[in-house]
């Protein structure tokens, strides 16, 4: 009976840890963001410059030739 109570308490503690870790980590991230300022955390994605949203006519022609 004691073992079952200990297992139940440990399970409840683990579930609380998992459910509250998201809020805890978000608080840490927000605090670090305030320390660094708004400019420090902007544009962290380094791959935005690699994507070109416009496809030129030459690109379309190349793709059509490639698919033949």
Curated annotation (Swiss-Prot):
Q: Which residues form the propeptide?
A: 37-68
The protein's location, in the record's own words, is: Secreted; Target cell membrane
Q: Sites of the modification Leucine amide?
A: 36
Signal sequence range: 1-23
Question: What keywords tag this UniProt record?
Answer: Amidation, Antibiotic, Antimicrobial, Cleavage on pair of basic residues, Cytolysis, Fungicide, Membrane, Secreted, Signal, Target cell membrane, Target membrane
Where would you say this protein principally sits, based on its record?
A: secreted
- Family that this chain belongs to: Belongs to the non-disulfide-bridged peptide (NDBP) superfamily. Short antimicrobial peptide (group 4) family.
Report the protein's function.
Answer: Antimicrobial peptide with weak activity against all bacteria tested (MIC>100 uM) and all yeasts tested (MIC>200 uM). Also provokes weak hemolysis on human erythrocytes (HC(50)=83.7 uM).
Protein name, per record: Antimicrobial peptide VpCT3
Please give the organism. Answer: Mesomexovis punctatus (Scorpion)
């Amino acid at each position: 009976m004691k073992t079952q109570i200990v297992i139940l308490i440990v399970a409840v503690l683990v579930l609380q840890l998992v459910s509250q870790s998201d809020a805890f980590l978000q608080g840490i991230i927000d605090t670090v963001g305030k320390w660094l300022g708004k400019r420090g955390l902007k544009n962290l994605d380094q791959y935005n410059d690699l994507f070109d949203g416009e496809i030129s006519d030459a690109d379309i022609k190349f793709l059509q030739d490639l698919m033949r």
